[in-house]
Amino acid sequence: MNKGKIFSMLPSVDQLLNNEAIISLIGVIPRSVVVKEIRQMIEEYRKNILMLNESQIIDFEIDIEEIIRKIIKNCYNFMDMNLREVINGTGTVLHTNLGRSLLSESIKEQVWDVASGYSTLEIDVTEGKRGSRYNHVSEIIKFITGAEDALVVNNNAAAVMLVLSTMAKDKEVILSRGEMVEIGGSFRVPDVMAQSGAKLVDIGTTNKTHLKDYENAVSEDTAAFLKVHTSNYKILGFTESVEVKELVNMGRKYNIPVIEDIGSGVLIDLQKYGLSYEPTVQESVSSGVDIVTFSGDKLLGGPQAGIIVGKKLYIDQMKQNPLTRAFRVDKLTMAALEATLKLYLDEEMALQKIPTLKMLTETAESIYERAKVLHSMIVSEKLDVVAGIAKDYSEVGGGSLPLEKLSTYVIEIESKSISTSKLENRLRKYRTPIFSRVRDNKVIIDLRTIKPEQYEIIVQAFNEVIQ
């Protein structure tokens, strides 16, 4: 047996297409996909054959049935949605890698109506003329925040870039060194500022910035003071920063506008529910800040969006900036954001129906009761595992409330038959992927980020992956 002989034993594309199992497959999978997977499988075998040494050639066999099984499996894998639902058992509420905020179940009908049909996206129904897509959300944002006007773009980095490009292109913007944040993915505020065309003037030190530092940096080229809320980290100890109100007064003294990026977009005072202080959008607006930017998909609990609120004078200018077109949001984002914001008209309703707020404010006692239910379901299956309930801490995530530790209860699972790493791996690769934590040789599932309707899926997953 030599490599040439083995190559001759490989089936051709046409031979495989004429196989009965493949013919049946083409009845449910597009032919183009099947042909693609056949060609890739043949190429994979060719590469493997080329890598064989003399001793391996002797025992090498071409198993046609195995090739067909692999092709069928690969075809179905290709047709599966890559972007799909997962179960978040990590306890990190705003898990960036798992999609951050969950949209409220209560808004799906409004979003679907807009998604599946024609809509009033850019039409003025009263006048029968072209309208603005931004009018759909600007009124409710203004009502909730108390701002003069509002504009929505596709994320908060875009919001900051649009604001700076409009208000400070080729001009200077003064920013404290202690607020030069990196917002994730290696994107940094100074980089966003440079891309906008604004010139950074950094003042103070990492841990201390005084009001006089801002004043000393003012020049005839100063276009704005910028405050960036350090929502994804905290500097503790020997520190000092300038309050927003102080900076606003300084801005009025020199006729310099104040821009504040508050990041997470809190619309409810979370301290009332046992969480740490996080500045609300309403506080920034009422303090006199000229322009405030924040995210839609963090603590606000809506879709990914960058929301700009503040003085109408500046927002009107932003609407004329060509970047607004590049950064504009689609009808799905508009529909989801408007419907989410409507829930804020009743604070109790917002806390109950917006998943992010509900998860953040759920008490440890409530989570414990839910943990008992899931634990009982797992134990009743008589699986080859040791399962227990333990106290633990959840995290907020998403670059929000970095020091916050939320008391929670978790299910700890230790398998008697497979390793913890293998168990975690199998759960993650389950058809509905289950993400967990691993600690002390146990798989940890935090109930804070688990929905009751997901319990059955979790139990079924354990049944299958431990077999």
UniProtKB/Swiss-Prot annotation:
Name this polypeptide is given: L-seryl-tRNA(Sec) selenium transferase
Q: Which GO terms describe its cellular component?
A: cytoplasm
Q: Can you cite a GO biological process for this protein?
A: selenocysteine incorporation
So what family is this one in?
Answer: Belongs to the SelA family.
Enzyme class comes to transferase
E.C. designation(s): 2.9.1.1
| Summary of the function given for this chain in its UniProt record | Converts seryl-tRNA(Sec) to selenocysteinyl-tRNA(Sec) required for selenoprotein biosynthesis.
| Keywords associated with the record | Cytoplasm, Protein biosynthesis, Pyridoxal phosphate, Selenium, Transferase
User: Which pathway?
Assistant: Aminoacyl-tRNA biosynthesis; selenocysteinyl-tRNA(Sec) biosynthesis; selenocysteinyl-tRNA(Sec) from L-seryl-tRNA(Sec) (bacterial route): step 1/1
Family annotation (InterPro entries): PyrdxlP-dep_Trfase, PyrdxlP-dep_Trfase_major, SelA-like, SelA_trans, SelA_trans_N_dom
Naturally occurring in which organism (per UniProt): Alkaliphilus oremlandii (strain OhILAs)
Its recorded reaction(s) are:
L-seryl-tRNA(Sec) + selenophosphate + H(+) = L-selenocysteinyl-tRNA(Sec) + phosphate
Coarse class of the primary localization is cytoplasm
Where would you find this protein in the cell? Cytoplasm
**Entry's Gene3D superfamilies?**
3.90.1150.180, Type I PLP-dependent aspartate aminotransferase-like (Major domain)
Known cofactor(s): pyridoxal 5'-phosphate
As stated in the Swiss-Prot or TrEMBL entry, residues carrying the post-translational modification N6-(pyridoxal phosphate)lysine are K298
